[in-house]
Amino acid sequence: MRNRFYLRWIALMLAMGLMTGCAVNPVTGESQLSLISESQEWSLGAEQYVPTQQTQGGQFYLDPELTIYVRDVGRKLAAVSDRPDMPYEFVVLNNGVPNAWALPSGKIAINRGLLVELEDEAQLASVLGHEIVHAAARHSVQRMQTGMIINAGIAGVGMAVANSEWGQMAMGGAAMGAQLALAQYGQSDELESDHYGIRYMVEAGYDPMAAVELQQLFVEMSKGQESNYLTSLFSTHPPSQERVNRNLALARELGSNGYRGRDVFEKRLAFLRSRQPAYDAYDDAIKQIQSENFQNALTNVNKAIKLEPGEAMFYALRGQLLEHLDKPAAAAEDFDKAVSLYPEMFRYRLQRGLNAYGRGDLALAKSDITDANRLVPTAIGYLRLGDIAVRENRRDDAVALYSTAAEAGGSVGEEARRKLAKLSQG
């Protein structure tokens, strides 16, 4: 299947890269291991950018102007970076977790959950500059070369893509992209990204004290671990007082009279901030689901929909709740709505397809799950397509689909292995 082919291709790139030895880090000027060429690095980032966005919530489509603003700030910083020729891209994700990430070749994302924690454009520049360094200094690539990421992908280990009991499993290349985005950086990588990110900020005209303020905020937040959401930020970008101290020393050395951009930032964030009560209600619904208070969760998600009826993720969550409450027909209407609002999102098509399968609409199930798997392959997707193949008397297809699903762990992989064994006996 495609995910296995892609992972073999990555493994082959690594093996071929053994011929290249060492190279100079384009940011630090230091010699480092180089098993992956620049062209391979760029291909990897391009291949994984959209699937990784999808597994992390998809694009924040309600306010495209916000993404344009973030992109413009990012481009200012990229232009003064040590690798200005990289094909940088910047996107805002519809994810309440305060985090940002960078894939190889400068494919960068920032969650709306982090944007609402910021106070001005200079702080945004601090975040983006930091991520630009991670990409420019090839930090993720270095981790791949030491086997810290690629091994997990080749092993076929799935990754949960939603923080709920209904979370599906991304497989193969899609799982590897998420691993790249959410991998924990070491302290040396973080210090390096802080240092050069601040220099990029100053070169682009921003006040470097914004980086100090942001790191101080993260240190304070980490002390209390105010919510599970913060775990993601602090696991991928661990804060420390040492980082605060170093940032402060560098900011004082470079001077702190740069641009802050509070007014323009607040203007650009106005729409998102106005919709925050709706996302708070959605987050409350998630918490209620985790506590198995499903009726309260339904009340909260209904509140979210009333506050922002154009948000697809609200309908998708209500559809999940209605399915749990044994109302599949009503759930189907919500999944239809989610797909109509954001047809590019794999998860909504997958959810609608699984709902259709449960209702016996095999044609819609097959179409939706196939489309979802083209975007982000999932174990549950392969499993249900295998079930459909069995019901359509396509034994060879069923064997291939079950075999792919069987690579996953958990109950889905176990069910696939059981059904595969039954087919083999037949």
Model-identified regions with their sequence ranges:
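Bacterial N-terminal signal peptides that target proteins for export
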Residues: 1-11
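C-terminal motif of bacterial Sec signal peptides marking the signal peptidase cleavage site
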Residues: 18-21
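Peri-catalytic and regulatory segments of divalent metal-dependent proteins
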Residues: 23-165, 182, 199-235, 241, ...
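Helix-start (N-cap) detector for alpha-helical repeat units in TPR-like alpha-solenoids
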Residues: 278, 312-313, 346-347, 379-381, ...
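Register position in tetratricopeptide repeats
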Residues: 290, 324-325, 358-359, 391-392, ...
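Structural marker of alpha-solenoid helical repeat scaffolds
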Residues: 307, 341, 374-375, 408-409
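Canonical tetratricopeptide repeat
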Residues: 317, 351, 384-385, 418-419
